[in-house]
């Protein structure tokens, strides 16, 4: 394999509309984080939601009308535990993002366990 030098970046010509790498960009023309045209009024929306339990990378299925609450909660718990199992090895290898996903999964699993226990107690009373 031979070494090939990196070609220099193309410089902008005086008539071009795109600034070169060394040209300062005026602050009024910096694009918004949402990718819209500046001043268009489209608000910035993050790609994730901080409210509620984490999704752990899977989409929760819609519950059918006749489904029992405890069965679907138990199924959700099993899928969360399965997803958490995939994060163990990367966490040991030092992955910070896997560690954060594992933490969120533990929090989500604890909430689901509480739901399952509450459902069991309700069923025991009847």
From Swiss-Prot:
Compositionally skewed regions (Low complexity) per UniProt: 9-43
> What InterPro entries does the annotation carry?
DOC_1/2
Q: Name one GO biological process term.
A: negative regulation of G1/S transition of mitotic cell cycle
In which tissues or organs does this protein occur? Ubiquitous.
Which stretches of sequence are listed as region Interaction with CDK2?
Answer: 64-106
Q: Which GO terms describe its cellular component?
A: cytoplasm; microtubule; nucleus; NuRD complex
* Location(s), subcellular: Cytoplasm; Nucleus
Function, please? Acts as a component of the histone deacetylase NuRD complex which participates in the remodeling of chromatin. Inhibits cell cycle G1/S phase transition by repressing CDK2 expression and activation; represses CDK2 activation by inhibiting its interaction with cyclin E and A. Plays a role in regulating the self-renewal of embryonic stem cells (ESCs) and in maintaining cell survival during terminal differentiation of ESCs. Regulates microtubule organization of metaphase II oocytes.
Subunit arrangement?
A: Component of the nucleosome remodeling and deacetylase (NuRD) repressor complex, composed of core proteins MTA1, MTA2, MTA3, RBBP4, RBBP7, HDAC1, HDAC2, MBD2, MBD3, and peripherally associated proteins CDK2AP1, CDK2AP2, GATAD2A, GATAD2B, CHD3, CHD4 and CHD5. The exact stoichiometry of the NuRD complex is unknown, and some subunits such as MBD2 and MBD3, GATAD2A and GATAD2B, and CHD3, CHD4 and CHD5 define mutually exclusive NuRD complexes. Interacts with CDK2AP1. Interacts with CDK2. Interacts with MAPK1.
Task: Fetch the PANTHER family from UniProt.
Answer: CYCLIN-DEPENDENT KINASE 2-ASSOCIATED PROTEIN 2, DELETED IN ORAL CANCER 1/CDK2-ASSOCIATED PROTEIN 1
- Protein name, UniProt field: Cyclin-dependent kinase 2-associated protein 2
Q: Which organism is it from?
A: Homo sapiens
């Amino acid at each position: 394999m031979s070494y090939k030098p990196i070609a220099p970046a193309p410089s902008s010509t005086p008539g071009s509309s795109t600034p070169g790498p060394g040209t300062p960009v005026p602050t009024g023309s910096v694009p918004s984080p949402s990718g819209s045209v500046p001043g268009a009024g489209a608000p910035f929306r993050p790609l994730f939601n901080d409210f509620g339990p984490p999704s752990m990378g899977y989409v929760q299925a819609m519950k059918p009308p006749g489904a029992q609450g405890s069965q679907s909660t138990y199924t959700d718990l099993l899928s969360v535990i399965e997803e958490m199992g995939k994060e163990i090895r990367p966490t040991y290898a030092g992955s910070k993002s896997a560690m954060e996903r594992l933490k969120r999964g533990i929090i989500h699993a604890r909430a689901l366990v509480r739901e399952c226990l509450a459902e069991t107690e309700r069923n025991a009373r009847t």
